[in-house]
Amino acid sequence: MLDLPDIGLYRTTQPLPGHEDTIPAGVLVYVGQLANGGTKFVVRPADNRRNRWFWRDPTTPLRSPSWAKSLKKLPSEGFYTLPETLEFSGGARWVKGAIVELGYNGEGRGILFVAEWREDGTENVLYFSDRGMLIEDKLLERLVWAPILPTKNTQAAANE
């Protein structure tokens, strides 16, 4: 049995042999597995909606353990809290413990989107911009998972 990585997000550090044009070094990829424990595969992102990547065919079978070992594991997209206050030029800052959404660019670099509450809004919800801040890997590795419960829009579901 091949020694291949767990399912999840990764950044390539080397091109995939035989697929250098489609899976070069320095890109975001998803390692997945076919249903029922089938073959593992690697795929580049297709679409980004609401700061999250979505994947689709074609996928590439993952058969190179040596290349797989070169992948850099990335934390899951989703919600986290900041482990420290971040200061930005112009005096802006995001405080320690702020809720942020983690996403990635196509190169597999982390992007944070800070939660905002709109004082003049009518809904009791947090908003996340579609523009975030690139972060260094050392911060990426220290983010604290925020277990925010995903739900469906009950009003939209009732109207279906």
Can you say where each PLM-predicted feature lies in the sequence?
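N-terminal helix-cap/turn-to-beta initiation motif at the start of protein domains
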Residues: 1-7, 69-78
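Residue-level detector of functional hotspots within protein domains
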Residues: 2, 15, 66, 86
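Transition segments tied to proteolytic processing and entry into folded domains
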Residues: 2-8, 18, 25, 147-154
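A general marker of short, structured functional hotspots
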Residues: 6, 26, 76, 84, ...
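A short beta-strand micro-motif
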Residues: 8-13, 80-84
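Basic/aromatic-rich interaction segments and small domains that mediate binding to polyanionic partners
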Residues: 11-57, 89-134
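Intrinsically disordered, low-complexity, charged/polar segments
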Residues: 44-76, 113-160
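Short, solvent-exposed interaction modules
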Residues: 72-90
